[in-house]
Amino acid sequence: MSKVLMVVAQKNFRDEELFIPKEMLQTEGHDVKIASLARAKATGMLGASVMPDMAVHEANPDFFDAIIIVGGSGSPVLAESEDVLGLVQNANARNKIVAAICLGPMALARAGVLAGKKATIFKTEESLKVLKQGGAKYTGEDVTVDGRFVTACGPHAANDFGRKLIEMLKEQH
């Protein structure tokens, strides 16, 4: 089955946006790894914690079929990380599935991979500005797919986001 990398902020990732798609992907037999900016415990907004399998700078996109940026109030930090932006750009250059949920699409926009693409995001003044600066066309949908890119607007869309990722991984193989 496919290998998937989920990237979370060290602090204040959105719990459901990690655990719901992760569980769905694993149930389908996909190998899911977690990365964060450091190999140290990451904590969610609702109190869950996870020990990342690797730091983002250790992640090689060649080993993964999909890269997912998890949202939450801490996720804008990921959009400021050269390691995260480089990972997204490298995954895109290798024609991988690139996905993000909630505020996670800010990292995709800052990496320059959403130019000319339709996308959705957790709507704030700042997030819409970053999407626009990245050349994305905001849809306002719960989940938006444009080619290999999947974006979702927040925790209530985590199930649909997971289902869409599973569909796309099946099509890839």
Question: Whereabouts are the PLM-identified features?
Answer:
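Short Cys/His-rich Zn2+-coordinating modules
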Residues: 116
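Glycine/proline-rich loop-helix segments at beta-alpha junctions forming the active-site rim
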Residues: 122-124
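Catalytic nucleophile serine of serine hydrolases
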Residues: 102
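Extended, subdomain-level signal for the structured scaffold at the beginning of enzyme domains
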Residues: 1-94, 98, 107-113, 128-173
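Acidic, metal/cofactor-coordinating or nucleic-acid-engaging core segments within structured domains
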Residues: 119
